[in-house]
Amino acid sequence: MNRELSLTKPIAGNAGGWINGFVGVLIFSGSLPATRVAIIDFSPVFLTVARASIAGLLALCLLLIYKEKRPNRQQVFQLAIVAMGVVVGYPLLSALALQYVTSAHSIIFVGMLPLTTALFAVLRGGERPHPAFWVFAILGSSFVIGYAVVQGLSVSPIGDILMLLAVIVCGLGYAEGAKLSKTLGGWQVISWALVIALPFMVPLGFMVRPSSFTGISTAAWVGLGYVSLFSMLIGFVFWYRGLAQGGIAAVGQLQLLQPFLGLALAATLLHETVSLGMLSVTIGVILCVAGSKKFGK
C-alpha cells in the first residue's frame, strides 16, 4: 500500500514540490553541524547507532500505522544496501571525520554527493551517459581532492579521507534508494531500511552507550535529536514528497543548494570560519555537478 505520508498539509501543484523539496534540503543541510555538536559528548559510534535506533523505532510505527506491505527478498537485499549507505555508513564515517575537521570543511565534500549518486546510478542502472559527463565528473572530483590535499597538510588528511568515503557510500545508498523507490515508494524505502538495521542498532547502542549520561550537555542532546528525527527520517519525507510533486529532474536540482546552506549554518550557529577557498571549491563543484547532470543521460 503506497500511501502519501502527511506530516504537514500537502501543497498542491508544482509549487508544492519545490517548497517540500527545499524544506528537505534545508533539513539535510543541518546534519553535519548537528553531528559536530553531538560528538562533543557522544562517541561517533554511539551517535550513529542511537540516531538509527530512534529513527528506526519511529519508522516501524509509521509502517505499522499505514499497514505497508512487506518488501520481498530482492527488495530486502536492496534495502540492506540503502541501510549500509545512509543509515550506517554515511552517519558513522562523517561523525568520525568531524573529530578531525570542522563541519564547514566537511561540507565541501557534500558538494560531491549529487555526483557520486549519479555515478552509482550509471553503474547500477547500466546507463551510458555522454562523454562530457565523465569530464565534469573528473573535474568536480579534482576540485575537492585537490583542495583536500592542500588543506590536509594543515588540517587533517584522516578527516578528508573519512569524508570522501562517507560521500561515496552515501551516493551508493541514494542511488539504490532512488532505484528501489520506483516500486516500493519514497518514504517507505528509508523507513524499511531503518527497520532492517534496527535489530543490529538497538543491541549495539546498549553496548557502546556512555557510562553516564549526567554530564551530557543540552547542545549534544539537541544534536542527537536533530540527526535522529530530522536528518534520518523527516527530511526524507519532505524530500521524496517534493520529488513526487514537482518531478525528480527539476526538484532534484535543489540538492545543489545544500553545500551553501550547510556553510551558512556552520558559520552562523557554530561560528566556524568559512574561507574564500571553501566557497570557491564549493561553487566549482556545483558547476561541475550541474554539467554532469546535463549530460548524465
Where are each of the predicted segments found?
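Transmembrane alpha-helical segments that form core, pore/gating elements
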Residues: 55, 59, 117-119, 123, ...
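Hydrophobic transmembrane alpha-helices of multi-pass small-molecule transport proteins
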Residues: 59, 80-82, 112, 120, ...
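Specific transmembrane alpha-helical segments of multi-pass solute transporters/efflux pumps
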Residues: 26-27, 31-32, 60-110, 146, ...
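Juxtamembrane helix-entry segments on the extracytoplasmic side of multipass membrane proteins
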Residues: 13-18, 40-45, 49, 71-77, ...
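Glycine-/small-residue-enriched transmembrane alpha-helix faces in small-molecule transporters
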Residues: 2-49, 92, 152-179, 200
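Juxtamembrane helix-loop-helix junctions in multi-pass membrane proteins
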Residues: 26-56, 102, 172-196, 210, ...
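Membrane-interface helix-cap regions at the ends of transmembrane helices
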Residues: 30, 34-37, 41, 55-72, ...
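Helix-helix packing/entry segments at the starts of transmembrane helices
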Residues: 49-50, 91, 105-112, 176-199, ...
